[in-house]
Regions:
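Long, contiguous binding/interaction regions
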Residues: 1-103
């Protein structure tokens, strides 16, 4: 088992406009990426659970050529709106860091 924080080269988030967030998880090499992909842990349902959005609202794409996964989903509060605690969306990857990968 490995935590995403230890297995991934990059785990980052940012706004995808004022109403959506995008999260990227990038691995060092094809072997690690393929092992993670084969587990099925990184999937729309994981992002739905971690970010409290319906799975059908999560756009999830593995990018084999970049050894990366990308997920885009609605923000719970629009960027800059009352109650927003991360106007740039750059701290929203934190819940992923402690996800266990059975690799």
């Amino acid at each position: 088992m490995a935590l995403i924080r230890d297995a991934a080269r990059v785990c980052k988030s940012k706004n995808a406009g004022p109403f959506e967030l995008t999260v990227d998880v990038v691995f060092d090499d094809a072997e690690t990426f393929q092992r993670v992909k084969a587990t099925g842990v990184l999937c729309p349902e994981l992002f739905a659970r971690l970010y409290n959005v319906p799975a059908e609202h999560v756009l999830f794409t593995p990018y084999d050529a970049a050894f990366a996964f990308k997920a885009t989903f609605p923000r719970l509060v629009p960027s800059g709106d009352f109650g927003d605690t991360d106007v740039y969306g750059c701290q929203q990857h934190a819940p992923l860091l402690d996800v266990d990968l059975p690799i």
